[in-house]
Amino acid sequence: MSIAELKAGEWAKVLAIEGGYGFRQKLLLRGIFEGRLVRVISNRGPVTIEIDRNIVSLGRGMAKRIRVRRI
């Protein structure tokens, strides 16, 4: 499942990132990488997530390429 499929308030662990080096670097700069725990704040329009008390907004296309497991 992807981050884009989660509902507001749900927690997930990042399992994989589907994309090339540039895409992975862009996410890494935002604190998103394999093994990271994230919480969805909002899933309306851009997907807004919380990572270690930081808020990050992702476009739906980006969010669909981040594979997660709900926890």
Language model region names:
Residues 1-71:
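Compact, glycine-rich, soluble single-domain proteins
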